[in-house]
C-alpha cells in the first residue's frame, strides 16, 4: 500500500479537530488513517493527555530535537513551538497507515517540499470571520487577548488557503463531515 500524508489545516475554531475526530470514528477513517501526534511546548489544556493529543515537552527538549534535525516540520505559533517529528512519521508508516498531519500553512509548505505528490492537503474554512470569533468565544478557554491574537492569525492563515488541494467551508457540521469523508475516500483510491 502506498501511504499518503494528508495535511489538514485551519484557523483555530474552524472545526478541524471536530471533523477529524468524527472522521476517525468512521470505518474508512479508523481502518486506514492515523493522526500524527505533534510535539508542543504549550501547556496542556484541561483533559489533554501527553502522547494522546500532543507530546508535551519543554522548550529545551524541543530545541534539542530541533538541533538534531528531528522534525519534518515545525513552527512557532502563539508563542509556543509545534512540530511533527520524523520518528512519529516513521512509527505510523510502519503501521501501514495513511498519515494525517494537523498542521498550519507553514508546516504544510515544509511537508509538501519533502513529500511532493505523496502529500495531499485540505484547508478548512469558517463560514465567516464573525462566526469564527463566536466559536472561539464559545469555547471559553482563551482570554479576550488570545482570541484577538487568534483572529489576527486566522486572517494570515486563510490567505494561504489557495495553496491547498481542497477547500472546505465548515458551516453545517453534518454536510462538512460528509464532504470531508468523501475527500479522504476519493484520495485513498487514487
Curated annotation (Swiss-Prot):
InterPro entries to which the protein is assigned, alphabetical: GK/Ca_channel_bsu (IPR008145), Guanylate_kin-like_dom (IPR008144), Guanylate_kinase (IPR017665), P-loop_NTPase (IPR027417)
EC number of the protein: 2.7.4.8
Molecular function (Gene Ontology), one example: guanylate kinase activity
Enzymatic reactions: GMP + ATP = GDP + ADP
A Gene Ontology cellular-component term: cytosol
Enzymatic class: transferase
UniProt entry keywords in alphabetical sequence: ATP-binding, Cytoplasm, Kinase, Nucleotide-binding, Transferase
Entry's localization field: Cytoplasm
Domain Guanylate kinase-like: 3-185
Pfam families reported in the protein's UniProt record: Guanylate_kin
Binding site for ATP: 10-17
Keyword flag Membrane: no
PROSITE patterns for this protein: GUANYLATE_KINASE_2
Function: Essential for recycling GMP and indirectly, cGMP.
Membership in a protein family: Belongs to the guanylate kinase family.
The protein's name: Guanylate kinase
Gene: gmk
